[in-house]
Amino acid sequence: RLLHHIYGRSGIKTRHSVVDDFKSSGSFELFFNGQGATPGTKSRNDTYISKGRQLFVDVANKLMTDSDFDTSDITHLITVSCTGFYAPGPDYDIINSLGLGSSIERYHLGFMGCYAAIPALKLARQLCMADKDATVMVVSVELCTLHFQARPVMDDMISASVFSDGGAGAIVSSKKPANGPYYSLDGFESAITEKGKEDMAWSIGDQGFNMTLSTYVPDILSSELHSFLDPIFEKYNITQDDISLWGIHPGGRAILDKVESTLSLKNDALRASRSVLS
């Protein structure tokens, strides 16, 4: 009953999973294939390899299809993931499948958690600022449902209700695309707080990866939000009223609600984040 309550209040309508066990018409391949509901880390990571490598390639292909760039334009490749490991890694798969140059520079940001896409974009921007000919492909894939824990632990139930499977990417370049809209990456800022290190963590266990995600995380973020944002507004000479649309990491409905109330945002200011969450 508690699990149904948590899922019902999550604000999420659809969850995607590469694991057939979770599909109504699927077969039991991972969680109930003779290992019970607690398969070992190796079995979970083997599924990450078989399912994840294709998703990395699919995202990369879509980036090229939807952009004005050719494969010959890509000078750097950044891959991002914290839900599995293998080598040669996803960078190798993308290069081979798309026919990218063998001399392309490759970087992987691993096990940094769900915020790692932001450092990846920052790294891409720095590479472009250092090289006027740089065009960087960034691909992030996470398969969180592989690490579902079938036990009545609150942290496990909360994390399972929020995180699922998917991939995303971007092409960051020193050159403006010939057609279509684009975003400009004007700057990045980050800060560390000691308050939450016991409330949000990610570690490797014998039966998959273990997520610590306490219910205090939204309150911790709320307490630090103004002290983090105020210097940024001053640095870029803007005010909160200048921002019409916010992209807040949708790490749960409670986080979005807390950010909205703390900053006194209008009801539709987080519509993009709520759309991603749902």
Regions found by a protein language model. Give the residues of each.
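Condensing-enzyme catalytic core mediating Claisen C-C bond formation in acyl metabolism
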Residues: 1-49, 135, 144, 148-223, ...
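Generic structural marker for isolated residues within well-ordered, non-membrane alpha-helices
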Residues: 3, 60, 91, 229, ...
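Short polybasic/polar patches that bind polyanions
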Residues: 8, 18, 40, 65, ...
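Short coil/turn segments at secondary-structure boundaries
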Residues: 39-54, 78-85
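Claisen-condensing/thiolase-fold acyl-transfer catalytic domains that form or cleave C-C bonds
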Residues: 47, 82-84, 89, 96, ...
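Acyl-thioester C-C bond-transforming condensing/cleaving domain
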Residues: 54-73, 82-205, 268
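Phosphate/pyrophosphate-binding loops at sites that engage ATP/ADP/AMP, CoA/4′-phosphopantetheine
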Residues: 59-74, 227-244
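Conserved beta-strand elements of the Class I
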Residues: 75-78, 135-137, 244-247
